[in-house]
Amino acid sequence: MINSLLTRLFGSRNERQLRQLNSIVAKINALETELQKLSDTALQAKTTEFKQSIQDGKSLDKLLPEAFAVCREASRRVLGMRHYDVQLIGGMVLHLGKIAEMRTGEGKTLVATLPVYLNALAGNGVHVVTVNDYLARRDAAHMGRLYNWLGLSVGVVYPGMPHSDKHAAYGADITYGTNNEFGFDYLRDNMALSKADRYQRGLHYAIVDEVDSILIDEARTPLIISGPADESPDLYIRVNRIIPHLTRQENEEAEGDYWVDEKGKQVHLSEVGMERAEELLHQAGILGEEDDSLYAAQNLSVVHHLNAALRAHALYQRDVDYIVRDGEVVIVDEFTGRTLAGRRWSDGLHQAIEAKEGVPVQRENQTLASITFQNLFRIYKKLSGMTGTADTEAYEFQSIYGLEVMVIPTNRPTVRKDYPDQVFLNRSSKFNAVLEDIKDCAQRGQPVLVGTTSIEISEMLSEHLRKAKVKHEVLNAKQHEREATIVANAGLPGAVTIATNMAGRGTDIVLGGSLDTVLAELDPDATEEDRFRVKTAWNRRHEAVKAAGGLHIIGTERHESRRIDNQLRGRAGRQGDPGSSRFYLSLEDSLMRIFASEWVQKVMRLMGMKEGDVIEDRRVTRQIERAQRKVEAHNFDIRKNLLDYDDVNNEQRKVVYAQRDELLDAESIKENIDSIRHEVIDALVTRFVPEHSIDEQWDLPGLQATLQSEWGLHLPLIEMLKGREEVDAERIAFLVQDAVDKHCAEREASIGAETMRALEKHVMLTVLDQGWKEHLATMDYLRQGIHLRGYAQKQPKQEYKREAFELFSEMLEHVKREVIASLARVRIRSEEEMAALEEQERRQVDTLLRQSQFQHQEAGGYGTGDEAVSLQRQLAGQGAAIAQVIRDTPKVGRNDPCPCGSGKKYKHCHGLVT
């Protein structure tokens, strides 16, 4: 109550901050008249003047009013667009390193030019991050005209571009690209073998467009560079043939071989199913001996393949989670509906789906480098973002990224009507209502955008509309090449557009169609009269659509996140235009079935509803939103959990990458190598000649043999020590050190000091990279089973940190030993051989990177993970008796009437006891 009173008196934090920024807007506006009087040359010269001021010590904050005013005036002259006051506020929010929530159609792309221009003046490079390559190239080309006019260079990075072009793009003042490309290049730079091979020049300032999509939706997707492993894919094909012979259970307690946990996205074999699977695996010749258990230690890889195959068949649907195109399985992003070409699910899931679909199964991949988007974007010294929907995730932005969300007011009031949800008993009734609504809009000349959650539904609706002879367009992952054209025409009178979540984010749907697109299609020789005629026709269409009610949004299903629903609604009602939205739901929808169906079903039963009847009640909508909040909270917990674990990896990643940077920047690492060599020799001698030990405990033959086998050094220690008195471990260490130092000095003299320095750097980099790659694989294995420590009353995260530290320390010690051993073994006779070796290694890395892939690594869901179930099954396989509960009465729901006849709900009666 006190908080609400204070808010009424002083305004919310958002309102107070907006008032402060409005005072700076007044300063910017005061400069406009003077700047309008300047010639183009004088206005362009302001950029040089600003750069000099920065070199003289002036801060960007002090420059902000004048720099924003210059950018606005330049935009008016070059692009024909002048920033509104609210857009100036949005620009300031971005410069301050915050997230600006701006509604669809408020000109986010134009807003970004203000902080981009100001921060690019510092000369450190600004990265503008977009959700796809099309938007990166479009914005770089369109806004590049403004930046180039102001004397700043612009580059764009995209997959597969030539090395020289990418170097130039990162060398520009402003670089556009996708989150994937910036992340991939960051990892690739940290695999480079020389400074010249690196692209990026540090991560200083980034503006992330559609920040919620990148920092929230994709936060559970680590970016992974992987190369093919050695294992044959044949086992996936053989295991896949077994799955159709297993029976799915309706629920955990029904008969069958496996049951599906849709909330947790897991599939579990029953006891009967485990026996049946073992029998089938024996018949297929995959398991050997008759008494060979599926969960015996030697068969763990078979368990891995079986789990992957079960998930592929039970959880992943074609044209929903993936499509098959040109003989390949291509992932469909669950949040955007776009295809993710080149990306693969990890843990053998992708191979299992390939086997299921009968396409060539590619080899599993080994992780070479990885980073989550969470940790990638936290590397930037300053980060900001824009989106139309961030406020629902404000807590996550603040707690994970330290980013505050500010809601920017619209330039004109929003007049869109959001109608209550309509809820039906089944999908067929729902889709009948959707089709009727679409036909009604088309007849009245009102454009309609239909949002679907999958390609399958979009194509099903398309088929029904085709039969009804309703002209329409489909925008999904299969037609993404025509995205810009479809979106440009989606606002035409009576246009019907069916879209998956992708829905053309980044491109406004203009009522009456896109005027710019129509003008661009005119003949280059078109007269002003032709252009006027086109504009007049567009104005008529624009007014006709407004009179029909503007763009109407139909949602065919609620998404797990309210934010995705709001994004769909936000397509209508841009810049004060009319518009409307309505969601059609059924009890068979995923969200309703899993999270919200029980309460709504009871309401429907009480109302005596039958097929075709509909509920339209705000209380139902609120109940659904409550379910969405639960899912959002659960997904936040998963992302936070992922970050907690990845933070451990991140600290290690920072150490390794910092070490690589030092190696690449150093002219010579001779002192480091000498220090490492002495440390390694001391450890080696201690291993065979322990300190404070007696002669009988020494293993001089073992030490001598190790020096010979690992380092190629013949040192007759036993003969050297014969007849000497008072020989101890310290004396032996001195003799070995001296012999090794002389051996290294002789090698350096034979090949030359310069070649030796190059060899030392090359070996150190190569061994460090190999050690890090193997360490990543070890960490993956550790992480997969670490939660089982909970059974031993231990805290899994603390155990993970402890073991990760031990593994990392072991890896560093191994790298030291291997570096010294490699330097002793490698035979280089000339500078030319060294150059050839470096070139060969560089070609291998280039080839590896060309073959590398992005991978999705799915985070776990509700309930117990696969590994915990596997442990339980292992115990069963080893003869541990697990009692099976047999239910002799029907299961009673918590909110059902108690069977005792009291009339109370079960949870308030006998349910209290259980």
Curated annotation (Swiss-Prot):
Its EC number is 7.4.2.8. InterPro entries: Helicase_ATP-bd, Helicase_C-like, P-loop_NTPase, SEC_C_motif, SecA, SecA_CS, SecA_DEAD, SecA_motor_DEAD. Its cofactor is Zn(2+). ATP binds at Q87, G105, E106, G107, K108, T109, D508. Keywords: ATP-binding, Cell inner membrane, Cell membrane, Cytoplasm, Membrane, Metal-binding, Nucleotide-binding, Protein transport, Translocase, Translocation, Transport, Zinc. It is a peripheral membrane protein. GO terms for cellular component: cell envelope Sec protein transport complex; cytosol; plasma membrane. One of its GO terms (molecular function) is metal ion binding. Part of the Sec protein translocase complex. Interacts with the SecYEG preprotein conducting channel. Has a central role in coupling the hydrolysis of ATP to the transfer of proteins into and across the cell membrane, serving both as a receptor for the preprotein-SecB complex and as an ATP-driven molecular motor driving the stepwise translocation of polypeptide chains across the membrane. Belongs to the SecA family. This is Protein translocase subunit SecA. It comes from Xylella fastidiosa (strain 9a5c). The lineage of its organism: Bacteria, Pseudomonadati, Pseudomonadota, Gammaproteobacteria, Lysobacterales.
